[in-house]
């Protein structure tokens, strides 16, 4: 590009900045030579990287793209001059709205001529940073202190970051001197901080990167930058953000929606629960009984509706590298890993390998969880009868009650498209598959459990599905990675809150944990069956529980009901909010991420909460949970 073309391009982009910022609109422009300007919304700061023209510098530009306002360019062919002019125009345009202050944070990698802050190697990367400041006319020592503190919290490969501060007048890195001259900074009321980063993410020669190291550094550096921007905004501007998360990106680019849709398409292409559910349970029970409970006939499964190999090909061809937002990239990467493991389990269905994949997906039973389960089985009598009406209702009667509950939510939002289907061939009890509640045609539902089961299946599983559907991310309806534990914990809690928790139900949850632990440690079907019989379960009950655990070849999922319940009880006891748990299908570890995305206005509050929560009796029970109710006290 000629100097004339560069000047013309700069002027055109500057005009776009002025026009769009005046309207409060985002600015996203490609700059010459692989550069990019992204301004999510008017903000009194920007992160900048200008790639040097005298050495390779792979990956450093990605360190600034975590922010809501960033620019990266290359020094050659006037790129540095263009970057300086665009930053000047941006500062000049936005600062009147924020008290006439503006902060520029430039990020560069440590040049070879600069000594490292601390010795590091490619085998044992040690993160470090050197801060250079220039702040004519104002004192930003406190901002430097905030940035330094949060940079020191960065940890890569078990090593905490080292930070060196070079105050005003210090020698700036070659080619990374202040982007704007002091006179211009003074005129704008702006300050610049330059962060020199130890390039631990670069391979030898700096032409390529270590992806995992770069990903970890991006996310942690982005968090440190937001803390510094938050402090700056609070102290020097009129912005006054709610929290540091709220300064993150709000505009979600097309690449994110494309990846979201592709992940959701893979997730909706199969149903692991249905695919590992035996279709011949009744004949297996009859054969097992005829053998005097010594030999188990083989389970049969429905044909797979998807080719796991082809699904994996689609899964791993999704272009995750186009996502700049580290939080969203993290969520999507987790889901990709989970889907890959689930597809492998489909391939291994009916083999010993299925159990290994199941353990990878759901984890083993811990000793504290096992002790809780054993205590329940020992302390809760198998002969205790629950209070309430006796008798049972048919599958069709239950389905009618469930359809009425779905209709309640449809009256609130016409996006509710849930259905209730009575079907043959499902043997593991009530089951939600996406937006459908499946009711086995042979089911007989105890009357005193009807409401509890409706709130378990519809008030939790379908409500979170529809709340997820109402969000911008389709993945919230199919579920973030590992969502099932929190889901099942919430669903079981709903049974207690609606007064439907019975001794038999609590014992069943505990029996699943004991059985899963036995299976994971090599016990056979007959071994687990006999173990449950010794705990006081009938032969039919023992067979049903063992069948759930052994479906597919060893399905560890059943331990998450009690584990999830304990997680939810702890969360609420510690003062956790109820509402975020229903934003969609999420895991407990995603709660802070949900709060971050809500602060950034990427996610909204749940469209609705389960209907049962408005009942006075439920509120009273919820209060008891918050006061520290133990799992054994759920029967009180």
Whereabouts are the PLM-identified features?
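Short pre-active-site segment immediately N-terminal to the catalytic Zn-binding motif
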Residues: 439-454
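Extreme N-terminal flexible tails
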Residues: 177-187, 194-356
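Active-site His/Glu-centered metal-binding helix of metallohydrolases
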Residues: 454-463
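Conserved alpha-helical "signature site"
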Residues: 505-636
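Post-HEXXH active-site segment of zinc metalloproteases
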Residues: 286-287, 448, 463-487
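Contiguous, non-catalytic segments that form substrate-binding/exosite surfaces or channel walls
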Residues: 310-442
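Long, charged/polar, low-complexity intrinsically disordered N-terminal extensions
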Residues: 1-153
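Post-HExxH zinc-binding segment in Zn-dependent metallohydrolases
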Residues: 477-516, 564
């Amino acid at each position: 590009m000629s100097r004339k073309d560069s000047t013309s391009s700069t002027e055109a982009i500057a005009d776009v900045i002025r026009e769009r910022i005046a309207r409060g609109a985002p600015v996203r422009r490609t700059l010459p030579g692989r550069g990019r300007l992204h301004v999510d919304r008017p903000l009194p700061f920007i992160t900048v990287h200008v790639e040097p023209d005298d050495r390779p510098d792979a990956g450093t530009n990605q360190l600034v793209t975590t922010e809501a306002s960033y620019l990266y360019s290359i020094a050659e062919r006037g790129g540095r001059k263009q970057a300086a002019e665009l930053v000047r125009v941006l500062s000049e345009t936005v600062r009147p709205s924020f008290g006439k202050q503006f902060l520029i944070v430039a990020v560069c990698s440590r040049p070879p001529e600069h000594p490292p802050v601390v010795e590091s190697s490619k085998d044992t990367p040690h993160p470090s940073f050197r801060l250079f400041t220039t702040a004519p006319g104002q004192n930003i020592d406190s901002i430097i202190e905030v940035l330094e503190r949060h940079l020191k919290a960065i940890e890569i490969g078990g090593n905490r970051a080292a930070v060196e501060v070079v105050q005003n007048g210090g020698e700036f890195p070659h080619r990374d001197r202040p982007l704007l001259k002091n006179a211009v900074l003074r005129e704008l009321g702006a300050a610049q901080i330059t962060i020199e980063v130890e390039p631990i993410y670069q391979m030898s020669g700096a032409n390529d990167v270590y992806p995992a190291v770069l990903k970890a550094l991006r996310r942690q550096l982005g968090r440190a930058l937001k803390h510094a921007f938050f402090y700056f905004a609070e102290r020097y501007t009129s912005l006054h953000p709610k929290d540091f998360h709220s300064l993150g990106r709000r505009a979600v680019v097309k690449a994110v929606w494309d990846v979201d849709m592709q992940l959701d398409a893979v997730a909706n292409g199969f149903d692991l629960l249905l695919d590992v559910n035996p279709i011949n349970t009744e004949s297996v029970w009859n054969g097992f009984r005829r053998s005097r409970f010594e030999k188990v006939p083989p389970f049969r499964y429905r044909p797979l509706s998807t080719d796991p190999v082809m699904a994996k090909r689609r899964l791993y061809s999704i272009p995750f590298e186009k996502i700049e937002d580290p939080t969203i990239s993290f969520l999507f990467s987790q889901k990709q890993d989970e889907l890959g493991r689930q597809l492998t389990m489909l391939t291994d269905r009916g083999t010993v390998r299925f159990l290994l994949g199941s353990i990878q997906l759901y984890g083993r039973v811990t000793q504290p969880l096992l002790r809780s389960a054993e205590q329940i089985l020992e302390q809760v009598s198998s002969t205790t009868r629950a209070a309430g009406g006796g008798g049972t209702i048919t599958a069709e009667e239950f389905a009618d009650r469930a359809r009425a509950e779905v209709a309640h939510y449809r009256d609130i939002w016409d996006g509710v498209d849930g259905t209730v289907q009575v079907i043959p061939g499902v043997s593991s009890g009530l089951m939600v598959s996406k937006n459908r509640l499946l009711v086995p045609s042979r089911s007989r539902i105890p009357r005193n459990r009807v409401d509890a089961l409706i709130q378990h299946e519809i008030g939790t599983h379908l409500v979170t599905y529809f709340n997820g559907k109402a969000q911008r991310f389709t993945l919230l309806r199919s579920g973030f990675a590992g969502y099932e534990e929190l889901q099942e914990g919430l669903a079981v809690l709903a049974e207690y809150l609606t007064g439907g928790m019975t001794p038999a139900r609590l014992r069943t949850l505990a029996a699943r944990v004991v059985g899963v632990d036995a299976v994971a440690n090599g016990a056979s079907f007959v071994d687990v069956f006999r173990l449950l019989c010794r705990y006081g379960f009938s032969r039919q009950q023992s067979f049903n529980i063992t069948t759930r655990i052994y479906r597919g070849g060893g399905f560890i999922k059943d331990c998450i009901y009690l584990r999830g319940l304990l997680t939810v009880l702890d969360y609420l006891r510690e003062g956790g909010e109820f509402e975020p748990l229903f934003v969609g299908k999420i895991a407990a570890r995603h709660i802070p991420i949900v709060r971050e995305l809500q602060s950034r206005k990427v996610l909204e509050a749940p469209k609705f909460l389960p209907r049962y929560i408005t009942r006075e009796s439920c509120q009273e029970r919820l209060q008891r949970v918050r006061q520290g109710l133990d799992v054994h006290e759920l029967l009180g």
